[in-house]
Amino acid sequence: MNFSTILLLAVALAMDAFAVAVAAGFQLRELTGRRIFRLSWHFGLFQALMPVIGWLSGKAVVSYIEAYDHWAAFILLCWIGANMIRESFDTSSDTPQKDPTRGARLILLSLATSMDALAVGFSLAALKVSIILPVVVIGVVALVFTWIGLLLGNRMLSSRKVGKQAELMGGGILILIGVKILHEHNVF
């Protein structure tokens, strides 16, 4: 597998991470370097680790996991998105927005955006491709795309001066990404 093919694969895998990062950036009123690093690092790390897991597992379990990976991503994204939408309608001012760069939400988003990378790992094993270069490129591209997505999403928030609507829109975007994943797997 040549470098340009690996790079195109990495960019394709990073699109979901980019879209989720835009939604997260849109939700976060204060985007610090620490938050950018945390989300970018986790998305890049998960995007890099999932192909390794798939590659190590090999072809034996491909048919079992491929049949359900898109459903897992869809459920995780819809669950997080629905919670964000519900929280956007909470009128109590003392209820803080949940930070997508911390805790369980960070891990769930990282998992949801990296499910396709698991299947790529299975494919790389089936093709008998070395895993090292693809994993490094996939991880770095996901990290960079997440970083850019956070900055773009936050810039859109700053330019519009919106409040709770940002969380509503971010939740809607996550649900749409989940629906897109199902559509890509020909569920409907």
Curated annotation (Swiss-Prot):
Give the similarity note.
Answer: Belongs to the MntP (TC 9.B.29) family.
Entry annotated with the keyword Cell inner membrane: yes
Q: Which gene encodes it?
A: mntP
Show the PANTHER family listed in the entry.
Answer: MANGANESE EFFLUX PUMP MNTP-RELATED
Task: Please provide the record's keywords in A-Z order.
Answer: Cell inner membrane, Cell membrane, Ion transport, Manganese, Membrane, Transmembrane, Transmembrane helix, Transport
User: Topology with regard to the membrane?
Assistant: Multi-pass membrane protein
Q: Which organism is it from?
A: Desulforapulum autotrophicum (strain ATCC 43914 / DSM 3382 / VKM B-1955 / HRM2) (Desulfobacterium autotrophicum)
Any one Gene Ontology MF annotation carried by this entry is: manganese ion transmembrane transporter activity
Function, as annotated, reads: Probably functions as a manganese efflux pump.
Protein name according to UniProt: Putative manganese efflux pump MntP
Keyword Signal attributed: no
A GO CC term assigned to this protein in UniProt: plasma membrane
Taxonomy-wise, where does this protein's organism fall, top ranks first? Bacteria, Pseudomonadati, Thermodesulfobacteriota, Desulfobacteria, Desulfobacterales
Q: Where in the cell is it found?
A: Cell inner membrane
**What are the transmembrane regions?**
6-26, 36-56, 60-80, 106-126, 131-151, 168-188
Question: What main location does UniProt list?
Answer: membrane
